[in-house]
């Protein structure tokens, strides 16, 4: 390096040393002071090396033929003068550094005694910070708002007050200039200082408190975006709320445009630019994405664990309650309802109570059916007489009572029917008992063989003509069937030799069938005679 470059480097190092010395006088933090002292020592060492390099370069340029011996220091040598000046300044800086260190040590030792009173430098810094923060009051910004459904969105707002007691957690109270929902709408009485309600009880906004680091730059309306067809904007309504709409026509000369609202009656309005805030879909989408990313960073894993823990606690809580006699939504088995299925999709666990924590009801609310045409006083008297029974007018209780009444009525009808059947015997049961009792041809048929007829005339008089006709038809069919059996037995008899046990058995069966046929023919004759007598009697009665 040349002599000029070395001189320039030395001057630069001196300026840096002066800056470090000033910083050491203003800094009280031990960590910062140690770093500054280390930087200062490095600069001093670098400066000494630079000065030595400068001296060596000057010696090389001015050296005589003598081997390596520098010329004696004279007052006319500028390098020696500069080196002497540098060493004197280095000593002064070291002296100032030691003095500043002693002063800082004394201040640290006496700090507990002087704790109520701050230093003048601290007072100046705090005053400067307060002056800077006070300048934010009345300024426009973009502040976040947490909606009732859980999402956060940024809206234009104005800072109305600050709380800067703790700068690390400073907050600001803002009023939204383009409120889109009722909870964002500034209270007119609060702005005039006449609102009688507190911030919590008033239906309108007295200012929303947000952290100072959450504020963003104010988004000024850019009406050039309205040139695009179908651009969206916020429109001020008579209710002071701003609703979304689509711009259909723009007049930049008159500064008016026509907007079709997206909600309500979807009517088309003509509004001035003062009541319009153009929206940028790209910015809105970007803000929404930033909000969603900031909200979901590191929350996905915790969300799954919290959901599993919540379900386990709900199931554990449900085990301490007695099991209900019926489950919620059991009536959907007989209908097309899907309410319980939707609830399960939304996270409901069968058997637990309603609500997020399972603190709600487990069984469905029972419907109450009051007596028709009665007053409520009468119904209350009935409930008092029943000792405050809550299920007195319950639909389920009435249904159980109706089922019991139906069961008792059915049992009585059955007993009455059986008694009626036991008293009145029809012709079919009589035929089955008297005529067909000896169909097997055994010993049970022997007492009937001695009787001349199975059905007497006196017994037939108790039955109607219709029953007699049916009985006669059945007897005819039974006679034909029995005769067919006799013919089949005769054919079987031809295949056996006479005198064998099989032939004797077949002969006994043929005799029994023939006796049965004779009895049925006798009964059929009695029925025919009874029918003929009734027919003749009817003709004589008509004559």
Curated annotation (Swiss-Prot):
What processes does the entry annotate via GO biological process terms? negative regulation of transcription by RNA polymerase II
Specify residue ranges for compositional bias: Low complexity.
65-76
| ZnF C3H1-type span | 186-209
Bias class Acidic residues marks the residues at 118-131, 277-304
**Main localisation:** nucleus
Q: Does the keyword Cell inner membrane apply?
A: no
* Source superkingdom: Eukaryota
Keyword presence, Acetylation? no
State the function annotated in the UniProt record: Transcription repressor.
* PANTHER family (alphabetical): ZINC FINGER CCCH-TYPE WITH G PATCH DOMAIN-CONTAINING PROTEIN (PTHR46297:SF1)
Protein's UniProt name: Zinc finger CCCH-type with G patch domain-containing protein
What is the organism lineage in this UniProt record?
Eukaryota, Metazoa, Ecdysozoa, Arthropoda, Hexapoda
């Amino acid at each position: 390096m040349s002599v000029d470059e070395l001189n320039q480097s030395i001057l630069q190092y001196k300026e840096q040393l002066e800056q470090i010395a000033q910083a050491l006088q203003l800094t009280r933090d031990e960590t910062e002071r140690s770093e500054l002292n280390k930087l200062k020592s490095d600069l001093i060492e670098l400066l000494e090396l630079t000065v030595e390099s400068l001296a060596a370069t000057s010696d090389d340029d001015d050296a005589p033929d003598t081997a390596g011996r520098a010329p004696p220091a004279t007052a006319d040598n500028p390098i020696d003068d500069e080196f002497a000046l540098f060493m004197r300044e280095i000593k002064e800086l070291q002296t100032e550094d030691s003095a500043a260190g002693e002063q800082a040590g004394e201040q640290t030792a006496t700090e507990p005694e002087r704790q109520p009173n701050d230093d003048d430098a601290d007072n100046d810094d705090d005053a400067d910070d307060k002056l800077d923060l006070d300048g934010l009051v009345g300024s426009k910004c973009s502040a976040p708002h947490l909606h009732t459904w859980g999402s956060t969105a940024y809206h234009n707002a104005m800072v109305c007050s600050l709380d800067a007691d703790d700068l690390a957690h400073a907050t600001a109270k803002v009023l939204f200039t383009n409120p889109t929902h009722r909870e964002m709408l500034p209270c007119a009485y609060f702005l005039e200082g006449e609102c009688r309600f507190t911030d919590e009880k008033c239906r309108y906004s007295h200012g929303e408190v947000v952290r100072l680091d959450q504020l963003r730059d104010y988004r000024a309306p850019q009406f050039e975006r309205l040139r695009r067809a179908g651009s969206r904007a916020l429109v001020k309504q008579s209710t002071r709320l701003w609703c979304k709409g689509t711009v259909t026509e723009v007049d930049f000369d008159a500064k008016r445009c026509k907007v079709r609202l997206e909600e309500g009656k979807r009517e088309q309005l003509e509004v001035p630019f003062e009541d319009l805030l153009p929206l940028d879909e790209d910015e809105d989408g970007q803000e929404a994405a930033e909000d969603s990313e900031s909200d979901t960073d590191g929350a996905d894993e915790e969300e799954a664990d919290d959901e599993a823990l919540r379900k386990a606690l709900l199931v554990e809580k449900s085990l301490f309650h007695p099991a209900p006699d019926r489950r919620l939504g059991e009536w959907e088995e007989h209908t097309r309802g899907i309410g319980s299925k939707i609830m399960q999709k939304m996270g409901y666990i069968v058997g637990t109570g309603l609500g997020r924590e399972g603190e709600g009801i487990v069984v469905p609310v029972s419907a109450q059916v009051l007596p028709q045409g009665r007053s409520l006083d009468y119904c209350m008297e009935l409930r008092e007489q029943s000792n405050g029974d809550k299920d007195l007018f319950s639909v389920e209780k009435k249904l159980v009572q109706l089922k019991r009444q139906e069961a008792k009525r059915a049992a009585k009808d059955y007993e009455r029917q059986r008694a009626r059947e036991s008293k009145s015997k029809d012709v079919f049961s009589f035929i089955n008992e008297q005529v067909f009792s000896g169909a097997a041809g055994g010993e049970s048929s022997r007492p009937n063989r001695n009787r001349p007829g199975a059905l007497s005339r006196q017994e037939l008089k108790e039955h109607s003509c219709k029953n007699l006709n049916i009985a006669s038809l059945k007897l005819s069919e039974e006679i034909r069937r029995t005769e067919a059996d006799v013919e089949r037995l005769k054919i079987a008899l031809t295949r056996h030799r006479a005198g064998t046990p099989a032939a004797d058995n077949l002969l006994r069966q043929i005799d029994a069938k023939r006796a049965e046929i004779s009895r049925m023919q006798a009964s059929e004759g009695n029925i025919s005679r009874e029918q003929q007598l009734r027919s003749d009697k009817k003709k004589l009665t008509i004559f």
